[in-house]
A protein has these predicted regions:
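Structural signature of transmembrane alpha-helices in multi-pass secondary transporters
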Residues: 46, 75-78, 82, 132, ...
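Paired small-residue
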Residues: 112, 123-131
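Helix-loop-helix hairpin linking two adjacent transmembrane segments in secondary transporters
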Residues: 124, 161-200
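Cytoplasmic helix-loop-helix junction between adjacent transmembrane helices
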Residues: 128-164
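Residue-level signature of mid-helix packing/kink "hotspots" within the transmembrane helices
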Residues: 51, 79-87, 137, 170-171
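Membrane-interface helix termini in secondary transporters
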Residues: 59, 90-91, 179
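Conserved MFS/SLC helix-loop-helix module at the cytosolic interface between two early adjacent transmembrane helices
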Residues: 84-120
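Extracytoplasmic
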Residues: 41-68
Length: 200
């Protein structure tokens, strides 16, 4: 029931945000500051999901009682998923409505993060990590959005803001997950990650 409620709220939040963005924006018409910074923040929060696992691998290995090799595969599978997302999902933004792609990826991302948090074994974590990696390519859709709706003279600056948000997420994710993992536990980190995606 909790999962159903969370996914419903995620869908409604993103639908409201994207509908309002659609109403306000016109191509080359200018990107309002609040939307630009929302794109940057969500880009950072989304891409951070790729790196939360790295400081947590040792803690996960001891709790799940698996080999170091199997645990290290979590990080590798996540990055493979990201590569697959870049290869197969991002190009769909030129063929289909970006709104639908973003909504679908948000839904799947929240689901996969919750699946990792509640996973009873390493195999479910592997599968959920692959989905997490695939769906964490959302920032790569935000970059062309920032470019498309910015005025010509602001395109470079606005794209830079979104990319800065992305890079901040990459750098901050390991610090945050390492701290939360030591204080609360690795499962709690993924519950927090799902909550952050929901708030976005």
């Amino acid at each position: 029931h909790i999962l159903i409620i969370l996914t419903y709220l995620a869908h409604e939040t993103e639908r409201h945000y994207l509908c309002s963005m659609k109403q306000e924006l016109k191509e080359n018409g200018g990107l309002p500051a609040h939307i630009l910074w929302t794109l940057a923040i969500v880009a950072g929060v989304s891409v951070a999901n790729l790196y939360y696992n790295q400081p947590l691998l040792n803690i996960m290995r001891h709790e799940l009682e698996v080999s170091e090799f199997k645990t290290n595969l979590i990080a590798m599978i996540t990055q493979i998923g990201y590569a697959l997302g870049l290869l197969f999902i991002v190009p769909l933004g030129d063929l289909y409505r970006r709104k639908n792609i973003i909504l679908t990826n948000f839904f799947l991302l929240i689901f996969s993060l919750l699946a990792i948090a509640m996973a009873p074994n390493i195999y479910i974590i592997w599968a959920a990590s692959l989905i997490t990696g695939i769906c964490s390519m959302i920032p790569q859709i935000f970059v062309p959005i920032a470019s498309q709706f910015s005025r010509p003279e602001n395109k470079g600056r606005n794209v830079g803001v979104v990319i800065s948000g992305l890079l901040t997420g990459i750098l901050a994710s390991r610090v945050v997950s390492g701290f939360v993992g030591e204080v609360l536990g690795w499962r709690e980190m993924y519950f927090i990650a799902a909550g952050m995606m929901l708030l976005c």
